[in-house]
Amino acid sequence: MITIDGSYGEGGGQILRTSVALSTITGEPVRIVNIRANRPNPGLRPQHLHAILALKHLANAEVKGAHVGSRELVFIPKKLEAKEISIDIGTAGSITLVLQALLPAMVFAREKVKFRITGGTDVSWSPPVDYLSNVTLFALEKIGIHGEIRVIRRGHYPKGGGIVEGYVEPWNEKRELVAKEYSRIIKIEGISHATNLPSHVAERQARAAKDELLQLKVPIEIRTEISRSIGPGSGIVVWAETDCLRLGGDALGKKGKPAEIVGKEAAQELLDQLKPGHCVDKFLGDQLIPFLAFSGGVIWVSEITNHLKTNIWVVESFLGRIFDVDGNVGEPGKIRVIRRV
């Protein structure tokens, strides 16, 4: 059994998500201690618990310590099987963080896996669902992974109630990813949404983002989406499609924050990611790590983050030395797979 120290590096939920996903894929039992030790409210949160329970279902696993607040978890997987997954986080817990745990494992099932998750679609400290469906999935397609993520209903903090449905196909053909420098930006796209709010909120977010991005001198199309849910909220995701991959930026609205500031923030984040000229933004970088171990390849990221370094550490705890990292945290960098699994 592999023991993982949950307080390593940035000591967040990602250690847990990647560990249980890798355990499911490899069939290797794992014990995780000091779960989220560096966080103000340590231990398992509802979104972590539901990700674990979904992976337990997929892997027919035996699990100990699976409850909110738990600081230690034992996960003993049996056989990975394709099953339908239905999760209600019960709070505005992040749907995309649950998916970050599920996606690497689901693609190793022998048949298509469908999922339906209820919770937060656009919440702080996690990628918005539009980022996952338009940036992450676009990159995964390049390595041979096919799937879909659809927003049925938005969910914001504190009420949640968002619904996301989708599926992934089995990863039958693993293709190497070589994503170094882009040579041109083809277009900018985006989605600006307002839920239980006037339509002008989404329109103003979109307009402000577009004004900021005009300097790139490429076609820009940011569509607005107005919807109803159980609570109000707004946000915007913008992405640049290059001749390599897509890079993204996003921002969330909140009470008292002008829509123009929200739009400008998302655009500025995208501009920051594009600046180094590397194909992979800092958010996608850490998301790709578990997949790259199996596909092989090389990625140049706009910024090496603690998240990325921590994810590499977890993957290598299971699989041995896989990656060579050139660069320091907080700076652009290069990640090369020196041994694919």
From Swiss-Prot:
Active site: 307 (tele-amp-histidine intermediate)
Entry keyword annotation includes Protein biosynthesis: no
InterPro entries xrefs: RNA3'-term_phos_cycl_insert, RNA3'_phos_cyclase_dom, RNA3'_phos_cyclase_dom_sf, RNA3'_term_phos_cyc, RNA3'_term_phos_cyc_type_1, RNA3'_term_phos_cycl-like_CS, RNA3'P_cycl/enolpyr_Trfase_a/b, RPTC_insert
Annotated ATP binding sites: 100, 283-287
Domain of life, per lineage: Archaea
EC id: 6.5.1.4
Keywords associated with the record: ATP-binding, Cytoplasm, Ligase, Nucleotide-binding
Subcellular location: Cytoplasm
Swiss-Prot/TrEMBL catalytic activity: a 3'-end 3'-phospho-ribonucleotide-RNA + ATP = a 3'-end 2',3'-cyclophospho-ribonucleotide-RNA + AMP + diphosphate
Gene Ontology CC: cytoplasm
Main subcellular location of this protein, as a coarse class: cytoplasm
MF terms in GO: ATP binding; RNA-3'-phosphate cyclase activity
Biological-process GO terms, alphabetical: RNA processing
Record function comment: Catalyzes the conversion of 3'-phosphate to a 2',3'-cyclic phosphodiester at the end of RNA. The mechanism of action of the enzyme occurs in 3 steps: (A) adenylation of the enzyme by ATP; (B) transfer of adenylate to an RNA-N3'P to produce RNA-N3'PP5'A; (C) and attack of the adjacent 2'-hydroxyl on the 3'-phosphorus in the diester linkage to produce the cyclic end product. The biological role of this enzyme is unknown but it is likely to function in some aspects of cellular RNA processing.
NCBIfam families named in the record: RNA_3prim_cycl
Family: Belongs to the RNA 3'-terminal cyclase family. Type 1 subfamily.
Official protein name in the record: RNA 3'-terminal phosphate cyclase
Organism name: Pyrococcus horikoshii (strain ATCC 700860 / DSM 12428 / JCM 9974 / NBRC 100139 / OT-3)
